[in-house]
Regions:
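Conserved, well-structured functional cores that handle cations and Mg-NTP chemistry
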Residues: 1-122
């Protein structure tokens, strides 16, 4: 419910953005990711295993977060969370699931990772 409310509120705020905050009439959406550690519980270890470089029982579970926000309003539009390692767990893998929130003509502003020529969002 909180996720749905966040997306809906972000979308409503984004639609009310002042035109001077648009780039050539286009909405600009920011995308970025980060990693976070979390408490060492059995549930967290199962969903977000600690890196294999850490000894068992010594490290913490790690998750990767990716968020899309509106440049004009600062509103959070959507986010994804996944394990820190494994197939499809990188920022690019997670952001693919967020592309449904982009409209034709929107501009994605992101760091150099997203400029990787082997990544095609469409």
């Amino acid at each position: 419910m909180v996720s749905a409310l966040t997306r809906q509120t972000g979308q409503l705020l984004s639609q009310k953005a002042l035109t001077q905050w648009l780039w050539r009439g286009r909405a600009v959406k920011l995308a970025d990711g980060t990693g976070v550690s979390m408490p060492d519980t059995a549930e967290n270890q199962a969903a977000y295993p600690q890196p294999s470089s850490q000894a068992a029982g010594v490290g913490f579970p790690l998750a990767r977060l990716v968020m899309v926000s509106c440049l004009a309003t600062g509103a959070a539009l959507d986010m994804a969370i996944g394990p820190h390692q494994g197939k499809g767990s990188g920022e690019l893998g997670l952001v693919r699931g967020l592309l449904k929130g982009f409209n034709p003509g929107d501009v994605m502003l992101a760091d150099a990772l997203y400029g990787n020529t082997s990544w095609s969002p469409i």
